[in-house]
């Protein structure tokens, strides 16, 4: 792979706006950034759960604040990487133009990476997967089950449903501003946010690039268009490795910080989590010793302040620097598309990551409030699927008369934007493809909901409000 192509700043449709070079000096990627920030889908992230249930408190992260943190960390890592590549002469073909573009692309990808997630955090994704596994074989269309009618790839798209794959749909199709190109972002930005460049038929948890579904069957031509333009093809875009690290660092730090602020975990428990690991490597030892020093130095201060200082001044830096060491050491393999690991897991910070993850799992993810929120979210999403999937089965079919009056009324609740997108993509397609697209219409609708809207709609449809 070559940076000239990987950083392709062209768009699927050339911008229809004529800009004067004297008055608009924005780069294509700065323009991407502005389009994302000003989009409704980005704003909706403020009402989507990160980990803790949404509340009026101003410190608990939402998807919006998480995405902004990922964007900031990713951009910072981009600046560090471009500086080192040039200083250490890791790539003779690397130019200043490449160096200027990379941080901007990563900033955009950080904002985008969670834009396809359904309500109620990652548990919402699992709720969708679980519902389709349980129900595709029982719902019928013309006396045959959907599991019999759909192709293997169509079925696997729902069995392996993934919010990251949904990002492509949101920004390139569902954001129907002027035409079918959505936000019409650059090829480089779109490619950087594709974490898994594989279809649902090629999911392989042993391979870093194919751990999860990367794009839906309905978006295969879009995926091919993007990866052909960047010449990444079925390889992972090099910047995706950096985006992944930024995401990991943001949630590892934020979950622990928010947990301390909410009184779910304290410094004594964090130190104990470190002490339960018998042999510390240098990275782990440095972080452990630093927390002990800070807790002694700031004795009497709020624990949330001490942990916040520790995470910001010590942990985050270790995770970033150790991950980037792996990026530099494996630069050629990454550029060749053969590196099969996450940067953070392959680094000397892996032990630290395992401790932080263990602390979060033990104290935070098992918290009663989080568990209750996840169970409620599962109930809401499952019920919405149970309600809307049967309602769309005979919509735009060869036998529309089989739609009930209730089905037709339910369809009026789906926005004209989603229905218009469906009609555009279903035009001229086979009956099976249309049926598949109608199922996607419902998942598109649900993934576009905020937590509050999903909860409110569920309550109204079930006579609870």
Swiss-Prot record:
Residues 63-252 form the HD domain. One of its GO terms (molecular function) is dGTPase activity. SUPFAM superfamilies: HD-domain/PDEase-like. The keyword Hydrolase applies. Residues 1-22 are annotated as: Disordered. Belongs to the dGTPase family. Type 3 subfamily. This is Deoxyguanosinetriphosphate triphosphohydrolase-like protein. It comes from Listeria innocua serovar 6a (strain ATCC BAA-680 / CLIP 11262). The lineage of its organism: Bacteria, Bacillati, Bacillota, Bacilli, Bacillales.
């Amino acid at each position: 792979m070559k940076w000239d192509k990987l950083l392709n700043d062209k768009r699927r449709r050339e911008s229809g706006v004529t800009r004067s070079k004297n008055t608009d000096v924005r780069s294509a990627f700065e323009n991407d950034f502005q389009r994302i920030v000003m989009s409704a889908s980005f704003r909706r992230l403020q009402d989507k759960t990160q980990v803790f249930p949404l509340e009026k408190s101003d410190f608990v992260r939402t998807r919006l604040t998480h995405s902004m943190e990922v964007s900031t960390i990713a951009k910072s890592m981009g600046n560090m990487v471009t500086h080192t590549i040039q200083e250490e002469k890791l790539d003779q073909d690397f130019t200043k133009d490449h160096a200027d573009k990379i941080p901007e692309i990563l900033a955009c990808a950080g904002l985008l990476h969670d834009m396809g997630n359904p309500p109620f955090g990652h548990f919402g994704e699992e709720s969708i997967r679980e519902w389709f596994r349980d129900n595709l074989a029982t719902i019928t269309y013309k006396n045959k089950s959907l599991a019999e009618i759909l192709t293997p790839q169509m079925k696997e798209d729902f069995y392996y449903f993934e919010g990251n794959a949904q990002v492509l749909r949101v920004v390139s199709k569902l954001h129907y501003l002027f035409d079918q190109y959505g936000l019409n972002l650059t090829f480089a930005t779109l490619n950087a946010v594709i974490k898994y460049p594989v279809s649902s038929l090629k999911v392989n948890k042993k391979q870093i690039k194919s751990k999860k579904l990367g794009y839906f069957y309905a978006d295969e031509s879009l995926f091919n268009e993007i990866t052909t333009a960047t010449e990444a093809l079925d390889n992972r875009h090099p910047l995706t490795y950096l985006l992944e690290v930024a995401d990991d660092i943001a949630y590892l730090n934020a979950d622990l910080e928010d947990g301390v602020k909410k009184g779910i975990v304290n410094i004594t428990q964090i130190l104990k989590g470190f002490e339960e690991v018998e042999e510390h490597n240098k990275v782990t030892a440095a972080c452990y010793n630093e927390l002990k020093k800070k807790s002694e130095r700031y004795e009497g201060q709020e624990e949330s302040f001490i942990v916040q200082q520790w995470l910001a001044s010590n942990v985050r830096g270790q995770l970033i620097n150790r991950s980037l060491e792996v990026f530099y050491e494996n630069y050629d393999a990454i550029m060749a598309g053969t590196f099969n690991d996450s940067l953070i897991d392959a680094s000397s910070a892996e032990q630290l990551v395992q401790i932080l993850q263990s602390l979060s799992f033990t104290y935070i993810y098992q918290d009663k409030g989080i568990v209750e929120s996840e169970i409620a979210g599962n109930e809401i999403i499952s019920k919405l699927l149970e309600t809307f999937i049967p309602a769309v089965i005979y919509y735009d079919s060869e036998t529309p008369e089989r739609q009930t009056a209730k089905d037709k009324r339910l369809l009026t609740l789906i926005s004209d934007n989603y229905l218009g997108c469906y009609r555009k993509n279903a035009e001229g397609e086979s009956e099976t493809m249309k049926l598949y697209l109608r199922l996607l219409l419902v998942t598109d609708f649900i993934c576009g909901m905020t937590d509050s809207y999903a909860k409110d709609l569920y309550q109204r449809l079930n006579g609870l409000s």
